[in-house]
Amino acid sequence: MEKVVCIGCGVTIQTEDKTGLGYAPPASLTKENVICQRCFRLKNYNEIQDVSLTDDDFLNILHGIGETDSLVVKIVDIFDFNGSWINGLQRLVGGNPILLVGNKADILPKSLKRERLIQWMKREAKELGLKPVDVFLVSAGRGQGIREVIDAIEHYRNGKDVYVVGCTNVGKSTFINRIIKEVSGEEDIITTSQFPGTTLDAIEIPLDDGSSLYDTPGIINNHQMAHYVNKKDLKILSPKKELKPRTFQLNDQQTLYFGGLARFDYVSGERSPFICYMPNELMIHRTKLENADALYEKHAGELLTPPGKDEMDEFPELVAHTFTIKDKKTDIVFSGLGWVTVHDADKKVTAYAPKGVHVFVRRSLI
């Protein structure tokens, strides 16, 4: 097939991957002028859609930003803070200032104080090598906190261009669409622009002083659980409502299964509470450690679901990660799934996740 390009952004048209760059429905190829799905949504509905990107593509974009004099706005999913992190961002974007914005704040328990969460984000960012000029919490879906971020962008950009970066599924496009609505009402002000030095298109939103805000394509972090489930199950892993913590008083040698996606063994220590922050729709099953392997072997895909029976053949094996908990209130985090808060110190636990999914400890978020 001869190469067809989108008349909106110049990207090469493809009809296979709906989430990929340059996707257009096969039927559209019969038209004289072909427009990709991303530009179509942009033009007709004033909506920005995320597209998938390879690591190399994404690094090219970040290096390109490093060669500009601009403000960078980094969006993370506060429910999956570490899983939606972009490593090395500070180095890659050069000396440009960075605003850190935690999205989906509305799904965390309302009892969590906003100020405490922002301080936690600052500490975590520092440990991960990022020194943001400011930190914000928003709910892009509900429009909460957006005006505050707009004011900060105006303050810090000083007439410069603004680049919004983030992984897929962090709500980056929803965030930008909220900004557009807040600033301009319903006007169709978006144009598309080739990103300097790459073949990838960034979305350009002209600002009133001659500079622009750019939406850059998102990157998939392969260590997140979302990478290993189908679209139906992905909805379960993307909570829309406030998380309801579930507490289990466990004796040692007891196990929790989170559907069939992950497992938590309390290996040794005194009887203690373990608080699970997982999507509300995800069933949690308790069993004895000595029965845990047999339970999974017999019931994975049925009692222990998601994934369903049909997906089990392709679902990666669960890999063990053992931790000795030395501090009170420590989180065991399953990247892209949730976390278990270990309330007391001096515990030995083992966490199982699909091969490739990151599991790690951190100081308690809540």
From Swiss-Prot:
Molecular function via GO: GTP binding
Boundaries of every CP-type G domain copy: 59-222
Keyword GTP-binding: yes
A UniProt-annotated Pfam family: YqeH-like_C
Function: Binds GTP and GDP.
Family: Belongs to the TRAFAC class YlqF/YawG GTPase family.
Family matches, as PANTHER family: GENETIC INTERACTOR OF PROHIBITINS 3, MITOCHONDRIAL
Name of protein: Uncharacterized protein YqeH
Organism: Bacillus subtilis (strain 168)
Lineage: Bacteria, Bacillati, Bacillota, Bacilli, Bacillales
Gene this chain is encoded by: yqeH
